[in-house]
Every structure is written in C-alpha cells, then in structure tokens.
Design a protein with these regions (language model features):
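Accessory beta-strand-rich segments of carbohydrate-active enzymes
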Residues: 1-80, 106, 244-247, 259, ...
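Active-site-adjacent substrate/metal-binding segments within catalytic domains
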Residues: 4-11, 16-19, 50, 75-84, ...
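Short strand-edge motifs at loop-to-beta-strand transitions and within beta-strands
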Residues: 23-27, 136-142
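Short glycine/proline/serine/threonine-rich loop/turn segments at secondary-structure transition edges
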Residues: 33-37, 146-159
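Non-catalytic, glycine-rich low-complexity segments
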Residues: 41-107, 180-185, 299-302, 451-480
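Substrate-binding clefts and catalytic carboxylate motifs of secreted carbohydrate-active enzymes
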Residues: 60-63, 296, 313-315, 332, ...
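Beta-strand-rich binding/interaction modules
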Residues: 93-131, 140, 162
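Aromatic-lined carbohydrate-recognition surfaces of secreted/lumenal glycan-active proteins
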Residues: 269, 317-319, 337-352, 415-420
C-alpha cells in the first residue's frame, strides 16, 4: 500500500526497505519499541527500481494509499496456515489438509487443533496434533477426509467455517484463527476447462481499484457496491488488473461466488512496445538474471497473501511484460505449488518460444472474433480466453454478441474479461459553476497525458452504470 518504494524508521532506527506497491510489507518493530512516544517515519520514493515493473495504465498517486496497522502477537502465534480443500472426482466427497507454522517464544510443546463446521455451526471434523520443531518454528499438518461436501461455485458459493486452535504447553488456549473455505475443483480435460465437472464459462470484467474522490484509496463500501453491481449484471468473474487488490476484496468474492484471476503486480509494456511496435530488445524482466528474484518475489507475495481464498481459480503472472526466462520462472513457481489452480499469462503470445512453458491458456487481448476462430480451427494447443476485450471507451460495447456466440460454437473458448469495470476519473469542483465534475488526464496541467484513455468502464467513476451495462447484463445473462 505504498507507491512506489519506501524506507522505514522507528525512533530513529532504520527498520527496512520495501517495494511492490500492492502487497503487504511487514516489519518486526519489537527491538525498537518504547513504552511511550514512538515515532514511525516512512520515506516514500516516487522513482525506484520498481518503476520498471509497475508501468500500469493509471494515474500516478505516490504515497501511502492503504491501511497501516500495528499488531501485537501472543507468545504462541500462528505465523502461517495453508488450507488445501480438495473436491474428489465423484463431486461428492473431499479432503482437507491444514499446514501450520507456529512461533512459540517460551513454550516448546504446542498442540494445534482443527475444527470444521458447516454453515449451521454443526461440527463436522475435530482433530489435533502435537507440532514439531522445524527451523526455529513449530510445524505440522492435519489431514482429514470427508464423505460428503457441498460444492462452491458462482450459483451457490457454499463456505465451511474452519478454525485453528493453538494450545500452550500448560493446556491453555493461546490463539484461535477462523477462516472460511470452500470445495471446488478446476481442471483441464481434453483442452477444455471444467469447474466441478462442468465446462467453465467466464463472463468477466477487469477491475481497477478506484474511487472518484479518493483515487486508489477505496473503502469497504466501494467494494460492496462493486460486488452488488457484478451480481446484478451477471458478471461472474473478475481479473485484478494489474496488481493484487486489498485483502477484503478476496473475502467478498469468496462469499459472493465471484471467480478471481489473481494478478501479480507486474507490467512493463513500455520496455517492449515502442510507438505501438513490438520491439523487445530492452524488455524487462525478459531473461535478465538481475530481474528474476524481483519478479519471483512479487509472485510469492501474491501467492502467500491470497493462497487460502476459494474464489481464486487462476494465478496471473502479470500484464503486458513480453516473455522470457524470468516470466517462465514465475510460471514454474506457481505450478510447483500444486494448489489445483491454473496459471494465466497473455504476453507469451508475442514470443511463441515460450508458449509451451508459460500459461495454461491461449490468452489474448482485443483479438477479433475471427482471430479467435482462426486459432480454434487450426490445431489449438490450449483452452482460449480473452483476458481483455470489448474496450469500453466512449459509446462502445456494441459487438459483445459476436464474441458470446463463440461460447456455443467452441468448447475450448471460455469467454473473457471486459475492459474494464470503472472509469478512472477524478471528481473536482468546477471553478466556474461550482458543480462537481469528473476530470481526466490532461485536466490538471499534466503534460504529456493520455487524456480520457483511463475512462473505459462499464460504470462511470462515480459508480453509476453506463448504457453499455444493458448489453453486458443481457448477453452475460444468457450464460448464467
């Protein structure tokens, strides 16, 4: 939540440095905290090495734009948990593994318990184990089988209530961590994507975080309004373009049954697109060894922050960053996690040398319907989605039906994500009329500017639905 890089001090002591503007940065302040009058200082930098990796199309607002939180943890604390619910092939039974990492300041004998309840709070599973010492932490995994489970999907996003209980050496309850989990299975069979045994159809949208009055500092009410709008208009999927969103958003998608393409904070289109031409001689990260750890760290941040969210069906490696060994390494990272999700990345399309090692999909942006058909009619290798289509700038959206027809014609075509959900424009007082008006790039003496190019939403910046939404509601509704 700091754009674009930061140094941190506490009481004059240097604590650390962080990049990656859209995932949490955590620091241990314990050695430097005083009982009173602590001074936490953040030095924010507009330009840093992160600038090469954060070239998204949006307004530049440098500074702190998400919550800053101070946490105190108990002596026995759950540092990390990974819930892995599995839906078996019979679509009736399942299993859950719960992997835990615990810090224990004084106690060496810690017991971890796992409790699973249904929506009505009936206890379905209760199991515990003694954690083992591993690399200055206590670790352990609990595995359970379930004869019957309710499925999670867009039509019925059924979530179970999971709890991890930690007990100290003396038997006292040290910590309880609740989490809601769901059972669903996404897989590719004969080049077709299935969710819970049924062909997956994506009626999706790309969504930037935006508020016309506060920019990227959005609140819970903004998120609730967006979820409500999507459900009302038959939108079943969202791509977090082109960075991880605020953490509450993923919980809301879990609850609402919105399928999520969770995108890593990476875009470097300026390094390989020059005046519209594809010219990758200066591409970052490409195959440059010095950039590999930086992009892998961003992939890790994305995965570790959101790995427990049922709504995430796809990990996306980033946006418009061409292809090379470093992007391939990101694909390997996600694939090795074996978490049952699929991996997405569009820009491998520009470099076919990597088409077999990057992305589980053939994925394009703004391909014409006939271009989609050309691929699907000529020995296609992968299922096809449009990660961006129907660029809704001005009075657009008239051609949506031409794309939707392809869903019925080709099993390997799974739909796509409209560009995009909300206009990025800023509400200001008109100096002449005194009325609230929306302003775009170039309206703030910012030169050069891309003018209204950030206004491509199916809702205006104040979240009022555009006329184009009628087209979305109708055509997307055909595939509910």
């Amino acid at each position: 939540g700091v754009e674009e890089a930061m140094y941190l001090w506490l009481n004059g002591q240097f604590i650390g440095y962080a990049e990656d503007s859209f995932t949490p940065s955590e620091f241990d302040l314990t050695p430097y905290v005083k009982e009173k009058e602590n001074v936490l200082a953040v030095q924010v930098h507009k330009m840093s090495t992160a600038a090469f990796l954060e070239d998204q199309d949006f307004f530049r607002f440098f500074g702190i734009f998400r919550n800053v939180t101070l946490k105190a943890i108990p002596d026995v604390h759950l540092e990390d948990v990974w819930f892995k619910p599995v839906l078996n092939q019979d679509n009736e039974s399942g299993s859950v593994s719960v992997s835990m990492k615990v810090s224990a300041t004084d106690s060496q004998n810690v017991t971890a318990g796992f409790i699973l309840k249904d929506r009505e709070e009936n206890i379905l599973v209760e199991k515990s184990l003694q954690l083992n010492k591993e690399n200055n932490h206590l670790e352990g995994t609990i595995c359970v089988d379930l004869e019957s489970v309710r499925l999670w999907d867009n039509h019925n996003p059924y979530l179970y209530h999971a709890y991890v209980e930690l007990k100290a050496e003396d038997g006292s309850l040290a910590e309880v961590i609740p989490y809601d989990i769901g059972f669903r299975r996404i897989e590719i069979i004969d080049k077709v994507v299935y969710l819970n045994g049924k062909r997956l159809v994506i009626t999706g949208v790309n969504r930037h975080e935006w508020n016309a009055r506060t920019g990227r500092c959005i609140g819970i009410e903004d998120m609730k309004a967006d979820i409500s709008c999507m459900l009302r208009n038959n939108i079943n999927s969202v791509r977090t373009c082109h960075y991880p969103d605020q953490i509450p958003w993923y919980y809301m998608c879990d609850d609402a049954g919105i399928y999520v393409m969770a995108e890593t904070n990476l875009e470097s289109h300026g390094s390989f697109q020059k005046l519209g031409a594809i010219e990758p001689s200066c591409n970052v990260p490409g195959s440059i060894p010095q950039w590999r750890d930086a992009v892998l760290e961003r992939a890790k941040n994305n995965f570790e922050t959101f790995k427990n969210h049922t709504s995430i069906l796809f990990w996306s490696l980033g946006n418009e960053s061409y292809a090379g060994d470093d992007i391939e390494a990101m694909n390997v990272y996600f694939a090795e996690k074996k978490d049952g999700r699929l991996v997405h990345y569009e820009s491998a399309y520009y470099n076919r040398a990597y088409e077999d090692t990057i992305s589980d999909f053939e994925t394009r942006m703004y391909a014409k319907p006939e271009d989609v058909e050309e691929y699907l009619n000529n020995s296609p290798k992968k299922p096809y989605i449009l990660c961006e289509f129907m660029h809704d700038m001005g009075n657009s959206m008239g051609g949506l039906g031409s794309y939707m027809k392809l869903i019925d014609k080709y099993d390997m075509y799974h739909g796509g994500f409209i560009w995009d959900f909300i206009d990025q424009a800023i509400m200001v007082k008109d100096p002449v009329t005194g009325k609230d008006v929306l302003r775009y790039g170039g309206d703030f003496d910012d030169k050069p500017a891309d003018y209204e190019f950030s206004a491509n939403g199916i809702v205006f910046a104040d979240r009022k639905e555009k006329p184009a939404m009628q087209e979305v509601r109708y055509y997307y509704g055909l595939y509910r």
